Amino acid sequence: MKRVREENETLHLENARRSPPLASTHFLGFPCISLFYSQHKSTKKNIYLDLKTKKKELLPMVFALRAFKIFLKLFYQHILLNLSTLITTFSLFLLYIVVTPLMIGFSKDFLCHFHLGLIWICLLFSFLPERFFQNDFEDGTLELYYLSGYCLQKILLSKLYGHWVLQISGVFCSFPVLQLLYQFDQSKMNWFTIIIGSQIFTLMCGIHSCLALGITSNGWNSLQNLTTLPTLLPLIVFCTSIETEWFHVILLMGYLLLFLFFYPILVSITLQTLLAK
């Protein structure tokens, strides 16, 4: 009996050595532990694959948020560095709208009928003299933007819109004085057209500035007149007639979308050839 017991113990030890504990059907009184281990391993693998696919799906969103964060940083930095633009735009626009009635008279009939044309001409004169990106080009900031690997068009667009916010804030601050002189109703349509039209003016200035970056200051005025006149006339017609016809609102929005479409193309062509030199 003792010999039989020893033989059974040795056989049991040999079987335990040959097969791993998790692969046995009965181990420490728990049956089918290998099935539980395989199920746990498969669920862990599925969770890993799900996380991997979700990470791939979220990558474009992460890059978009990072680009938007850079856009806001440049936008905010441009506003902080150019707060003097708010004062200059406010003073220029206020000077134009005060001097014009002094020259043509304070007739209520004339000012009520032609106030939109006068406002848009004053707005144009306060927006157009700017030379965007000239200081950035001279001190090498544009080259750093170009070599950074980020989208140069978006960087310049953020700087343009930062400048637009400062300018349009100066214009809106002078509206109470404008109301006293011209005596017109401040309708929502006037605010809407000024916001859209001023964006078009800013995009026009940005395109002209990019085209004239390599030109000296002597040839800037002639180039500005040649490039702005063809794009200026339809915009002035739309903005002055927008009080009577709603169809011109759609044309004005289409004009804005047209400039938003052509802006990155023209900027990329001009700046890449200029900075490559």
From Swiss-Prot:
Location of this chain's protein in the cell: Mitochondrion membrane
GO cellular component: mitochondrial membrane
UniProt entry keywords in alphabetical sequence: Cytochrome c-type biogenesis, Membrane, Mitochondrion, Transmembrane, Transmembrane helix, Transport
Entry's transmembrane regions: 61-81, 110-130, 164-184, 194-214, 227-247, 249-269
InterPro entries to which the protein is assigned, alphabetical: Cyt_c_biogenesis_CcmB
Domain of life: Eukaryota
Cleaved signal peptide residues: none
Pfam families hit by this protein: CcmB
Entry GO MF terms: heme transmembrane transporter activity
Family: Belongs to the CcmB/CycW/HelB family.
Protein name listed in UniProt: Putative cytochrome c biogenesis ccmB-like mitochondrial protein
